[in-house]
């Protein structure tokens, strides 16, 4: 028997109330969860995220230097002393295959840590939205929390677009009722419905605005 799925979305980690969600989906399109998705696709063994850089370093040192990579970014820039930043272009198959990645970013890792204790946790970006949606449907769980990462505590257009894309795909493909629980997700779903055929155009308009580093 398929359960009713309840979907909610919050823009940033600080907005999330106490929750009994079965599933959490964290989105940081620019760029943590996009990088995580590509790294795993390219053969990374696993990825561990940290808010604290010193803890990241101490943990990474316990691993064979040939089988680990340290990734860290603050304010859109790679931090000195780390192997990589948070660009998806850097996590090539040749670079990450078979390695454990230790990662810290300005926004995405904060959201991942916020919901780390849920039963099922997904890192989603636009390219893997359908795969995440299919997996959520197959799990047949009731409460799904979608969490954006924003930019330094503020709203992110691209995260909300991705949240809307996820909700749209679940609604279109789930054989039972899907409840949209809050205005944040209703707005994100509307955003996706307007722009789903012109994602590139929206991205170019958004990135052309010099509001933050990419």
Q: Regions from the language model: what does each represent?
A:
Residues 35-42, 59:
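Short active-site loop/helix that positions an aromatic residue
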Residues 174-203:
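Flexible, glycine/charged-enriched surface loops at secondary-structure junctions
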Residues 50-137:
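Acidic/Gly/His-enriched mid-domain segments of enzyme catalytic cores or analogous surface patches
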Residues 13-14, 24-38:
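Short acidic, Gly/Ser-rich segments with clustered Asp/Glu that frequently serve as metal-coordination loops
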Residues 127, 138, 155-169, 174:
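Glycine- and Gly-Pro-enriched alpha-helical subdomains that act as flexible
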Residues 1-3:
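N- or domain-start disorder-to-order transition segments that initiate the globular core
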Residues 5-6, 22-25, 45-48, 67-70, ...:
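Structural motif
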Residues 206-214:
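Single conserved hydrophobic/aromatic residue that forms the stacking wall/gate
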């Amino acid at each position: 028997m398929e359960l009713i799925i309840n979907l909610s979305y919050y823009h940033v980690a600080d907005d999330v109330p106490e929750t009994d969600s079965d599933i959490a989906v964290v989105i940081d399109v620019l760029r943590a969860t996009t990088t995580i998705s590509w790294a795993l696709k390219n053969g990374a063994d696993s990825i561990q995220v940290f808010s604290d850089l010193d803890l990241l370093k101490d943990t990474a040192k316990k691993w064979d230097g040939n089988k680990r990579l340290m990734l860290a970014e603050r304010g859109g820039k790679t931090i000195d002393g780390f192997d990589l930043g948070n660009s998806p272009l850097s996590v090539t198959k040749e670079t990450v295959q078979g390695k454990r990645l230790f990662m810290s970013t300005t926004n995405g890792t904060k959201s991942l840590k916020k919901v780390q204790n849920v039963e099922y946790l997904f890192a989603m970006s636009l390219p893997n939205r359908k795969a995440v949606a299919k997996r959520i449907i197959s799990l047949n769980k009731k409460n799904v929390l979608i969490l954006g990462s924003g930019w330094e505590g503020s709203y992110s257009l691209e995260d909300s677009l991705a949240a809307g894309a996820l909700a749209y795909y679940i609604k279109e493909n789930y054989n039972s009722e899907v409840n949209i629980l809050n205005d944040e997700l209703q707005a994100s779903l509307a955003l996706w419905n307007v722009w789903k055929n012109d994602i590139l155009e929206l991205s170019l308009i958004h990135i052309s605005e010099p509001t933050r580093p990419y």
